[in-house]
């Protein structure tokens, strides 16, 4: 009988010891200093003690406050201390969002000023901690309006389970499955105190959500970057998740991959990798970034292609020319020839345009033409933007302009220094350029009727006209006075020499403008085009055409509704007076003061306007250096 009672007595003794430990030992062990080995009783060290009487002595972890922002409020310190000491929350991290200086607009950074993230031991622990915290905020800080999300009380869960059992019997139903996201695994509290938000999560849920990555600084993001798990799972969503997060195999479409471009694959969470590629691309490290190629990812290939352009622009011209062949081969190898997007073709145009300007004999203008033809043949429609790019290349091409690049200069993609190479007439050069533009326009707009394609200009973007006017004029000539140069001149130019233009094609453009844009002076865009045309004619000293065009513009610039209040714009008149004065022709200046000045007053222009007065003062010095004429104007 005694033998039969011993196991029961021993089991009862073990339960008694465990209950004593739970009641008296838990708080002190978890929150007391670490015990030394000498403080353990001899009974615990007895090797003959049965296993069911042995208990593990848990060594307490020291309480450590996390690093808090320097300018954080005192209440944040108090709350974090309360979470650790009273609620038992572990691994707390605090993120300061009050000084967000990143250029990218991220909505997650505008939720609050301080984000606190902590880990609980279990779902029940988090439920208890959330309830205790709401009571603490209410009684300690008097904030009954604090909001909590994600807290599901046991009573609600029990009622939900009973309701499901009544509907479907005792068998489990799809609605009862939490799909791995159990209740109280993530609790968020808006404390309504100093813009502090608190997130309590279980360890598993915290790892899955990785909230730290949302609110950490850009420098710390690699610390929280998670690699996609590769282990197989029997989760019903594992197949879908694996499809969307697995690395995609690079397709070659029958073309062998160049040996210097090893394959690069990136997982679904790839922001750090993309940031690294952006840095490499902007710095021009095309050899380094080429290691990360993936022809299935247009974003990556665009960065690789742009790195070649940035590399070239960061070099002196002589070194850039030395690397040109190697750079060209690397660019063409990285270009996705069979599935290139419109952006890829645009980047390729910029690269080829740069190479053509550097060495026109090695890369002729035909490579730029072939790039657009290639884009069209691959199913991409040529747009007005492409037309502008093409005209810009025609204007700046050293081959078409019979010029060469000065090897002693530094290359600049926007303003490249060229020198004239021959004596070919400007008109023949201009005609050749316009022929190429007309051919390209037919490619962009195949439905245009045969004949002069410039007659259909009214259907294009108005910004194309200044480019065409540049083709028919010599704006780069050393004697040509541009509007910018005119504003910088403080005195008239002595003995200004006329700068010729392509009269035939300028007249054709003027005819198109006369039909499509008669009201020159009523619209800002058309007004600038009108000023450009006047400048071309004035630089050629064709003053009769200048005034004829001016009269036609004034006649067509009357407001449509005569009863409306119409105040004439003084800026075109001020520009015309300044243009006549700075070119410095005394005879023409006197004609203007005799005939055009009364016309200006008749059209309601205020002669006391500061711009009018400044330009007129210079004009009077040109027309009457002895200061004896035009008393009425003075």
From Swiss-Prot:
Pfam families from the UniProt entry: mRNA_stabil, RsfS
Subcellular location: Mitochondrion inner membrane
Example of a GO biological process term: mRNA stabilization
Keyword Transit peptide: yes
Main localization (coarse): mitochondrion
Segment annotated as transit peptide: 1-36
Domain of life of the source: Eukaryota
Signal peptide annotation: none
Keyword Transit peptide: yes
Membrane topology classification: Peripheral membrane protein
Species the sequence originates in: Komagataella phaffii (strain GS115 / ATCC 20864) (Yeast)
Keywords, sorted A to Z: Membrane, Mitochondrion, Mitochondrion inner membrane, Transit peptide
SUPFAM superfamilies: Nucleotidyltransferase
Family: Belongs to the ATP25 family.
Cited InterPro entries: Atp25, ATP25_mRNA_stabil_dom, NT_sf
Protein name: ATPase synthesis protein 25, mitochondrial
GO CC, alphabetical: mitochondrial inner membrane
Function of the protein: Probable mitochondrial mRNA stabilization factor.
